[in-house]
């Protein structure tokens, strides 16, 4: 009887150690992913500081408050264009307005209700 109790206790101890190990591995993976996301975000922001005037960055920040998905889409498009060498001069507020309008027009959906 005592051996059975010891065996059960040993199984519980092993299971607990395995769960703790898995938890620590998962936590490390999440921390690494968060670190990589932060690095990518820092790179995106550095590129945006290079290509946008302060007024344009301010406008994009305001758009991010209202429409975060649109702001993210614009950021990624601008970064891609910059990396492809298609942006040769800084983008001011007026140019950013045009870009926002073009992207908004492309992604806007019309809903019609038929009676």
Curated annotation (Swiss-Prot):
The keyword DNA-binding applies. One of its GO terms (cellular component) is cytosol. The keyword tRNA-binding does not apply. Gene3D superfamilies: PDCD5-like. It holds the Pfam family dsDNA_bind. GO terms for molecular function: DNA binding. SUPFAM superfamilies: Double-stranded DNA-binding domain. PANTHER family: PROGRAMMED CELL DEATH PROTEIN 5. This is DNA-binding protein PYRAB09250.
